[in-house]
């Protein structure tokens, strides 16, 4: 069993709302079809969700009726993205089953909780890849809040205990001087980040959150990598149990 989290930046251009690049998805789907291993697929929202969520101020929960319109529009945009990905994967022979994130996840002050694992387990038993995405879900204290695909990957790992989790991005892994700059860090431990912003590794914002979830997964005993979605050579090597020519492995 493998969990693959496809970052929104790997398949959309966040500077252009509702933009979608399906070519990387096609290449990945062909590889996954050929390798034939059990999967769970999770994707981010990218330019489909982020502009709407930002415009309606959903990052800190919901406080008024205007924001509830933002919840509606964000979930609709994410389902449109999911539908496009589902169709493209099916064309390449990868069967997925869409599980609406809000039907299985809840949150408390923005912290994800897998409240109803049944649909995920049932899909896996039937041999189809569950597909989820980062989304706006009901929050016991904030009304609605956003949970990331990375948080979902951590919780589903806790449920299924896969042998491998891949975070696929628009860059080849974590770099010593920020996105695409400096040396590619082939292995990364939590302690390597003590000097963030100084002379060690410069990671901030969304990547820092992604790393936190990735390390939590690695500490469960699951090998965890960050790779470019376009680096099919490395992805195939990792799935085959070999060392990839690129990518960053998270070490607990």
PLM regions: where:
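C-terminal catalytic "cap/lid" subdomain
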Residues: 2-252
